[in-house]
């Protein structure tokens, strides 16, 4: 399978009053077309910085990121970011939020927005405003707004971190269902090992700062994945051992 995303020799440091702060050591990895990769690591190790570099929002000091074999030095039009903070416009309805990113001349914008609202379980809420929705429903709006523009790559930075455990689990199940219907390459940053196992095809474990990839785990289990199955429990234990737990 062809590589969709190639990260080669990435390094990054920031200037501080106490001198350079080395955040990212040398990191190399590839993500195949249609693959779901999760990146986990200790708090403050540079996960978000790494994602911002991969997504094109931060320039590395060394190395390069290539999408479809072409080096990128800024955000790729083929990708879109879903963050923990959220990006729903409070003055727009669900339908209007979904239509916002579509080209002004896109035919049937409303029909397309309504289709994706239905896909993420928001049928009947198209005319609702964000303040009328729960946290889980708002996250569904964000997901639908990302998907409606048909990105080839989804960059996700702790997208479910603000949700309660049950809602987070429901959203994981919804996301896997959608990805079974539509092909997207995904890069997920998360502190939640179970979330990574539940969603990903491969998991990269980052070291403490300056971050490097200290371990890679394949996740060969079919979906749906049961978090209490012996295989999943065993994989979780192996990943946690990388953190000394």
Regions found by a protein language model. Give the residues of each.
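Helix-to-loop junction immediately C-terminal to a conserved catalytic motif
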Residues: 55
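ABC-type ATPase nucleotide-binding domains, specifically the catalytic core motifs of the NBD
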Residues: 15-17, 92, 96-111, 119
């Amino acid at each position: 399978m062809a590589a969709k995303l190639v990260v080669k020799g990435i390094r990054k440091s920031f200037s501080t009053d106490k001198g350079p702060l080395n955040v990212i050591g040398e990191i190399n990895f590839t993500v195949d077309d249609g693959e779901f990769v999760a990146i986990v690591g200790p708090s403050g190790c540079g996960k978000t910085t790494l994602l911002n570099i991969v997504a094109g929002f931060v320039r590395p000091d060394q190395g390069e990121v290539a999408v479809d074999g072409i080096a990128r030095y800024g955000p790729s039009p083929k990708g879109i970011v879903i963050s923990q903070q959220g990006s729903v416009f409070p003055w727009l309805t669900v339908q209007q939020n979904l239509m916002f990113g579509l080209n002004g001349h896109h035919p049937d914008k409303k029909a397309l927005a309504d289709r994706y609202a239905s896909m993420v379980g928001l049928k009947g809420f198209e005319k609702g405003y964000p303040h009328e929705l729960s946290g889980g429903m708002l996250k569904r709006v964000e997901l639908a707004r990302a998907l409606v523009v048909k990105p080839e790559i989804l960059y996700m930075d702790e997208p479910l971190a603000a949700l309660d455990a049950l809602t987070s689990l429901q959203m994981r199940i919804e996301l896997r269902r959608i990805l079974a219907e539509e092909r997207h390459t995904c890069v997920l940053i998360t502190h939640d090992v179970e979330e990574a196992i539940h969603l990903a095809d491969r998991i990269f474990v980052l070291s403490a700062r300056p971050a490097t990839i200290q371990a890679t785990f394949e996740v060969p289990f079919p979906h749906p994945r049961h978090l209490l199955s012996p295989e999943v429990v065993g994989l979780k234990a192996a990943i946690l051992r990388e953190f000394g737990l």
